[in-house]
């Protein structure tokens, strides 16, 4: 018998002072049985960083041909493709050719550093690719926010993401390994 995804609900209030964007959203995240709590919370953080009414989570781990989240336009084109982890060159190329903008969130300190050394020059070929890195310590702190029902406040200013709920406060500094040219 196949294991089912665990459903998480998040009510998120985003005040993105860098983009002058303010948004309240009720999100549903399906955590695949093979997905860690840290990875699920990184998906949520990626959504917060690029918050938009049209930004949607996809089937994620269940669908190899889709990103973790995407922002589709009215013509069904992909304006933003959000990827997590350490994808191979083929996956990066696919994302960068199908979407106007691609945001990759790398994590897992040791593996990510090695992956970046091996893929940095290949990633530089894609002018629409952003590569963000979140270290293990911040990712562990972020995972403490995980709850089946979450109410989160997020403020983004000067590149920092301030996240809070009824119990926790956290400042997250994503490291920009690559920005679009």
Curated annotation (Swiss-Prot):
Signal sequence bounds? none
Give the Gene3D superfamilies listed for this entry.
Restriction endonuclease-like alpha-beta roll domain (3.10.640.10)
Q: Which InterPro entries match?
A: Restrct_endonuc-II-like (IPR011335), YaeQ (IPR009822), YaeQ_sf (IPR038590)
Q: What name has this protein been given in UniProt?
A: Uncharacterized protein YaeQ
UniProt organism field: Salmonella typhimurium (strain LT2 / SGSC1412 / ATCC 700720)
